Swiss-Prot record:
Protein name: Serine/threonine-protein phosphatase 2A activator 2
Catalysed reactions, semicolon-separated: [protein]-peptidylproline (omega=180) = [protein]-peptidylproline (omega=0)
Residue spans of biased composition, Acidic residues class: 367-382
Gene designation per UniProt: RRD2
UniProt region (Disordered), positions on chain: 1-67, 367-400
Function, as annotated: PPIases accelerate the folding of proteins. It catalyzes the cis-trans isomerization of proline imidic peptide bonds in oligopeptides. Acts as a regulatory subunit for PP2A-like phosphatases modulating their activity or substrate specificity, probably by inducing a conformational change in the catalytic subunit, a direct target of the PPIase. Can reactivate inactive phosphatase PP2A-phosphatase methylesterase complexes (PP2Ai) in presence of ATP and Mg(2+) by dissociating the inactive form from the complex.
Record-level Gene Ontology MF annotations: peptidyl-prolyl cis-trans isomerase activity; protein tyrosine phosphatase activator activity
Key words, A-Z: Cytoplasm, Isomerase, Rotamase
Organism, as annotated: Gibberella zeae (strain ATCC MYA-4620 / CBS 123657 / FGSC 9075 / NRRL 31084 / PH-1)
Amino acid sequence: MTSQAPPQPASSPGVAAPAAASSIPNLKDRLPKLEPRKRRSGPSNPTPIPETPALPTPPDTSSNWTFKTPSRRILSKKDHDIFLSSPTCKLVTAWVFGLAESIVDTPNSAIRDADLSALIKTILHILDETEQLVTKSPPNEQGGSRFGNKAFRGLLDLAQKNSAAWHHDIGVQNEDAINELSTYFCESFGNANRIDYGSGHELNFMIWLLCLYQLGLLKQSDFKPIVLRVFVRYLEVMRVIQMTYYLEPAGSHGVWGLDDYQFLPFLFGATQLLHHPYITPRAIHQDLTLEEFGHEYMYLGQVSFVNSTKTVKGLRWHSPMLDDISSARSWTKIDGGMRRMFVAEVLGKLPVMQHFLFGSLVPADDSMSEDTGAGDEADVEDDPHAGHDHTGKAHDGTGWGDCCGIKVPSSIAAAQEMKKRGMNQGLRRIPFD
């Protein structure tokens, strides 16, 4: 018998028969094709990283060389523009960047005492004696004031009196040369009239070292010790001076500045950490890393010092710019950023460079203005703008575009006064931190 298929049920009236399978649309074809999302590249900095110019050969000063007492020559924006395109600007840039490149991936301890030349040892001894002068000019009692202590002027007077003998020890015998170098050296510890200190004074110290190079006393073989021993010792001396005399920040940008006083520790420090295998930019938020490596790397050491001088805990509250920079992917990006900042925020800022001093070893362009004697030497104690070019400027004391920045008391003073009153149990936390 042949089997028969079961009878199909009859379609109900008014109900359509099911459509054939071939007529059902493939909804998969109607869905948009999934493609990998293209990640947006971060905003690139249109400003190229400044290159290191070639460092010129030192001039022959053995005969027929006329030394000059350094003076201000950047008295207007026009003078500043001339400076920025001058050989001297390239000389300063080559000097600072050349020193930075000499310490790539090199910690402070890499330079041993046995590696130091006699001149480097003498310079370190001079800095030791400078620190000892602090005890001979103790700070005046100011009743808890956070503004600069006038006893600082006594320290600078003592440094000036010792300067000639110190330069004889270095090997500078010409009295005119000593006068030129002493001006840079004494101006590297701060301004006596305003009782302040900033990146311009720090730059004066580097120019003093540049003058020693121009005289043929310092050699390129001394570059590493110059940064890792001499400059590091200078930082230590300046921290003692800042904490003793409550030096006011020169042209401070407040919390929106990189640091109240220093810049070069960050530039040199980023170069030291350029290819470090495990210390990343985020490490500045790790107290143990700062404690263990702060003495080896200037960047970490400066962050640690900044933390110790604040009354509030947390970089994002007291140093938001440092906090922002720590999000960079690598030290290479930070190194490039610090180079840009040196050119733009130090050499490129008139409020900083109007105090720059030009002599014979670091000369001014002939077309720049001559100093009429109304510079820092003629500053009036109660007038922080004395001797400055105010043509076309609105000096209302606000914002970053004014001549001298924002005049603020020392943050170091606040921390030191709290310690004197026994309030050093720990830093305050922001309530919503």
